[in-house]
Amino acid sequence: MASMRTAAAAAMLACIAVVLASTAADGALLPWFGGGGARDEAVPELGLLAAADPFRILEHVPFGFDRDDVAMLSMARVDWRETGDAHEVVVDVPGMRKEDLRVEVEDNRVLRISGERRREETTEQKGGGDHWHREERSYGRFWRQLRLPDNADLDSIAASLDNGVLTVRFRKLAPDQIKGPRVVGIASAGGDDGGKKSIGGAGEGQNQQAKKVEL
Protein backbone atom coordinates (compact mmCIF):
# COMPACT_ATOMS: atom_id res chain seq x y z
CA MET A 1 0.00 0.00 0.00
CA ALA A 2 2.84 2.38 0.91
CA SER A 3 4.61 1.64 -2.35
CA MET A 4 1.43 2.48 -4.30
CA ARG A 5 1.16 5.83 -2.51
CA THR A 6 4.82 6.57 -3.22
CA ALA A 7 4.34 5.76 -6.91
CA ALA A 8 1.23 7.96 -7.10
CA ALA A 9 3.07 10.85 -5.46
CA ALA A 10 5.99 10.45 -7.86
CA ALA A 11 3.61 10.46 -10.84
CA MET A 12 1.93 13.65 -9.60
CA LEU A 13 5.30 15.40 -9.16
CA ALA A 14 6.31 14.32 -12.66
CA CYS A 15 3.10 15.77 -14.12
CA ILE A 16 3.61 19.07 -12.30
CA ALA A 17 7.20 19.22 -13.57
CA VAL A 18 6.00 18.71 -17.15
CA VAL A 19 3.38 21.45 -16.82
CA LEU A 20 5.88 23.84 -15.23
CA ALA A 21 8.29 23.25 -18.09
CA SER A 22 5.56 23.73 -20.68
CA THR A 23 4.34 26.99 -19.16
CA ALA A 24 7.75 28.66 -18.83
CA ALA A 25 6.79 30.98 -21.70
CA ASP A 26 3.15 31.21 -20.71
CA GLY A 27 1.83 34.54 -19.44
CA ALA A 28 -0.92 32.76 -17.51
CA LEU A 29 1.27 32.68 -14.39
CA LEU A 30 2.74 36.14 -14.80
CA PRO A 31 1.27 39.59 -14.13
CA TRP A 32 2.55 40.75 -17.54
CA PHE A 33 4.70 39.29 -20.32
CA GLY A 34 6.04 40.26 -23.72
CA GLY A 35 7.54 43.65 -23.06
CA GLY A 36 10.55 43.59 -25.36
CA GLY A 37 13.03 41.66 -23.20
CA ALA A 38 14.71 38.36 -23.94
CA ARG A 39 12.50 35.54 -25.19
CA ASP A 40 12.97 33.54 -21.99
CA GLU A 41 12.85 36.45 -19.54
CA ALA A 42 9.70 34.99 -17.98
CA VAL A 43 11.53 31.93 -16.66
CA PRO A 44 13.14 33.61 -13.60
CA GLU A 45 9.81 35.25 -12.67
CA LEU A 46 8.03 31.92 -13.02
CA GLY A 47 10.65 30.33 -10.79
CA LEU A 48 10.10 32.96 -8.10
CA LEU A 49 6.34 32.50 -8.29
CA ALA A 50 6.63 28.71 -8.10
CA ALA A 51 8.99 29.00 -5.13
CA ALA A 52 6.55 31.28 -3.31
CA ASP A 53 3.55 29.05 -3.97
CA PRO A 54 4.32 25.94 -6.06
CA PHE A 55 0.67 24.84 -6.11
CA ARG A 56 -0.57 27.95 -7.97
CA ILE A 57 0.26 26.06 -11.16
CA LEU A 58 -2.87 23.99 -10.49
CA GLU A 59 -5.03 27.11 -10.78
CA HIS A 60 -4.14 27.39 -14.46
CA VAL A 61 -4.64 23.78 -15.60
CA PRO A 62 -8.30 22.87 -16.22
CA PHE A 63 -9.69 20.00 -14.17
CA GLY A 64 -10.32 16.79 -16.06
CA PHE A 65 -7.01 16.76 -17.93
CA ASP A 66 -5.47 13.30 -18.18
CA ARG A 67 -2.00 12.00 -19.07
CA ASP A 68 -2.54 12.61 -22.80
CA ASP A 69 -3.53 16.21 -22.11
CA VAL A 70 -0.34 16.84 -20.11
CA ALA A 71 1.66 15.50 -23.06
CA MET A 72 -0.16 17.87 -25.42
CA LEU A 73 0.67 20.81 -23.13
CA SER A 74 4.36 20.11 -23.71
CA MET A 75 3.76 19.88 -27.49
CA ALA A 76 1.93 23.21 -27.90
CA ARG A 77 5.01 25.43 -27.63
CA VAL A 78 4.52 29.19 -27.96
CA ASP A 79 6.72 31.92 -29.45
CA TRP A 80 5.78 35.57 -28.93
CA ARG A 81 7.46 38.20 -31.11
CA GLU A 82 6.96 41.97 -30.97
CA THR A 83 7.78 44.10 -34.02
CA GLY A 84 7.67 47.84 -34.50
CA ASP A 85 3.93 47.92 -35.13
CA ALA A 86 2.50 44.52 -34.13
CA HIS A 87 2.66 41.41 -31.94
CA GLU A 88 2.81 37.86 -33.31
CA VAL A 89 2.09 34.71 -31.30
CA VAL A 90 3.05 31.40 -32.95
CA VAL A 91 1.96 28.00 -31.59
CA ASP A 92 2.99 24.55 -32.81
CA VAL A 93 -0.15 22.43 -33.28
CA PRO A 94 0.99 19.50 -35.46
CA GLY A 95 -1.71 17.33 -36.97
CA MET A 96 -4.56 19.65 -35.98
CA ARG A 97 -7.21 21.27 -38.16
CA LYS A 98 -8.76 24.68 -37.59
CA GLU A 99 -11.93 22.91 -36.43
CA ASP A 100 -9.87 21.44 -33.56
CA LEU A 101 -8.66 24.85 -32.33
CA ARG A 102 -10.21 27.75 -30.46
CA VAL A 103 -8.75 31.26 -30.08
CA GLU A 104 -10.43 33.70 -27.68
CA VAL A 105 -9.63 37.08 -26.20
CA GLU A 106 -11.27 38.20 -22.97
CA ASP A 107 -12.12 41.69 -21.75
CA ASN A 108 -9.35 41.48 -19.14
CA ARG A 109 -6.78 41.32 -21.99
CA VAL A 110 -6.16 37.58 -21.80
CA LEU A 111 -5.54 35.67 -25.03
CA ARG A 112 -6.58 32.03 -24.67
CA ILE A 113 -5.62 29.34 -27.18
CA SER A 114 -6.98 25.82 -26.76
CA GLY A 115 -7.50 22.72 -28.85
CA GLU A 116 -7.89 18.97 -28.92
CA ARG A 117 -6.25 16.29 -31.02
CA ARG A 118 -8.38 13.15 -30.99
CA ARG A 119 -7.24 9.59 -31.46
CA GLU A 120 -8.27 7.97 -34.71
CA GLU A 121 -10.57 4.98 -34.41
CA THR A 122 -8.74 1.84 -35.54
CA THR A 123 -9.95 -1.55 -36.69
CA GLU A 124 -8.72 -2.92 -33.35
CA GLN A 125 -11.22 -0.67 -31.57
CA LYS A 126 -13.89 -1.85 -33.98
CA GLY A 127 -13.15 -5.49 -33.12
CA GLY A 128 -10.52 -6.06 -35.83
CA GLY A 129 -7.06 -7.58 -35.52
CA ASP A 130 -4.76 -4.50 -35.51
CA HIS A 131 -1.69 -4.77 -33.29
CA TRP A 132 0.33 -1.72 -32.23
CA HIS A 133 4.12 -2.17 -32.33
CA ARG A 134 4.79 1.44 -31.30
CA GLU A 135 2.58 4.38 -30.28
CA GLU A 136 4.44 7.66 -29.64
CA ARG A 137 2.21 10.38 -31.13
CA SER A 138 0.53 12.69 -28.63
CA TYR A 139 -3.23 13.08 -28.31
CA GLY A 140 -5.40 15.09 -25.96
CA ARG A 141 -6.19 18.72 -25.14
CA PHE A 142 -4.00 21.75 -24.63
CA TRP A 143 -4.77 25.13 -23.10
CA ARG A 144 -2.48 28.18 -23.16
CA GLN A 145 -3.20 31.74 -22.15
CA LEU A 146 -1.22 34.97 -22.36
CA ARG A 147 -1.90 38.33 -20.74
CA LEU A 148 -1.65 40.96 -23.45
CA PRO A 149 0.15 44.29 -22.90
CA ASP A 150 -1.64 47.63 -22.76
CA ASN A 151 -0.59 48.50 -26.31
CA ALA A 152 -2.43 45.51 -27.83
CA ASP A 153 -5.21 46.45 -30.26
CA LEU A 154 -7.81 43.85 -29.28
CA ASP A 155 -10.03 44.69 -32.26
CA SER A 156 -7.30 43.78 -34.75
CA ILE A 157 -6.61 40.22 -33.57
CA ALA A 158 -6.56 37.68 -36.42
CA ALA A 159 -5.53 34.01 -36.52
CA SER A 160 -4.37 31.68 -39.30
CA LEU A 161 -3.30 28.04 -39.54
CA ASP A 162 -0.65 26.78 -41.96
CA ASN A 163 1.15 23.41 -41.96
CA GLY A 164 0.50 22.72 -38.28
CA VAL A 165 1.50 26.21 -37.12
CA LEU A 166 -1.09 28.56 -35.61
CA THR A 167 -0.27 32.27 -35.91
CA VAL A 168 -2.15 34.98 -34.00
CA ARG A 169 -1.39 38.60 -34.94
CA PHE A 170 -2.57 41.91 -33.51
CA ARG A 171 -1.49 45.50 -34.04
CA LYS A 172 0.09 47.79 -31.46
CA LEU A 173 -1.67 50.95 -30.38
CA ALA A 174 0.10 54.28 -30.63
CA PRO A 175 1.12 55.77 -27.26
CA ASP A 176 -1.66 58.37 -27.45
CA GLN A 177 -4.25 55.60 -28.05
CA ILE A 178 -3.44 53.66 -24.91
CA LYS A 179 -6.00 54.23 -22.18
CA GLY A 180 -4.44 55.08 -18.84
CA PRO A 181 -5.89 54.39 -15.39
CA ARG A 182 -9.17 56.14 -14.62
CA VAL A 183 -8.92 58.87 -12.00
CA VAL A 184 -11.69 58.79 -9.39
CA GLY A 185 -12.49 61.94 -7.43
CA ILE A 186 -12.63 61.84 -3.62
CA ALA A 187 -15.59 63.36 -1.76
CA SER A 188 -14.91 65.67 1.18
CA ALA A 189 -15.77 64.67 4.74
CA GLY A 190 -18.55 67.27 4.85
CA GLY A 191 -20.57 65.38 2.27
CA ASP A 192 -19.73 67.61 -0.69
CA ASP A 193 -19.80 65.30 -3.67
CA GLY A 194 -18.81 67.89 -6.21
CA GLY A 195 -15.73 65.91 -7.17
CA LYS A 196 -17.18 62.48 -6.57
CA LYS A 197 -17.50 60.04 -9.46
CA SER A 198 -19.32 56.75 -9.73
CA ILE A 199 -17.20 53.61 -9.78
CA GLY A 200 -19.84 51.52 -11.56
CA GLY A 201 -23.04 49.75 -10.65
CA ALA A 202 -23.50 46.44 -8.92
CA GLY A 203 -22.04 43.54 -10.80
CA GLU A 204 -20.04 45.68 -13.23
CA GLY A 205 -17.27 43.63 -14.81
CA GLN A 206 -18.56 40.38 -13.37
CA ASN A 207 -19.96 38.93 -16.60
CA GLN A 208 -17.03 39.27 -18.95
CA GLN A 209 -17.50 37.36 -22.18
CA ALA A 210 -14.65 36.11 -24.33
CA LYS A 211 -14.50 37.18 -27.96
CA LYS A 212 -13.87 34.27 -30.32
CA VAL A 213 -11.30 34.82 -33.05
CA GLU A 214 -12.16 33.10 -36.34
CA LEU A 215 -9.45 31.08 -38.08
From Swiss-Prot:
What biological-process terms (Gene Ontology) are attached? protein complex oligomerization; protein folding; response to heat; response to hydrogen peroxide; response to salt stress
Keyword Endoplasmic reticulum attributed: yes
Principal cellular location given in the protein's record: endoplasmic reticulum
Family the entry assigns: Belongs to the small heat shock protein (HSP20) family.
Task: Name the UniProt key words of this record, in alphabetical order.
Answer: Endoplasmic reticulum, Signal, Stress response
Q: What is this protein called?
A: 23.2 kDa heat shock protein
State the superkingdom.
Eukaryota
Region: Disordered; residue ranges are: 183-215
sHSP domain spans which residues?
69-189
Alphabetical list of Pfam families matching this protein: HSP20
Q: Which residues cross the membrane?
A: none
PANTHER family with a match to the protein in the record: HEAT-SHOCK PROTEIN 20 FAMILY MEMBER
Report the leader peptide range. Answer: 1-27
Comp. bias intervals (Polar residues) = 205-215
Induction (free text): By heat shock.
CDD domains referenced in this protein's UniProt entry, alphabetically: ACD_ScHsp26_like (cd06472)
Cell location: Endoplasmic reticulum
Tell me the subunit arrangement. Answer: May form oligomeric structures.
GO MF, one annotated term: unfolded protein binding
Mind telling me which GO cellular component terms the entry cites? endoplasmic reticulum
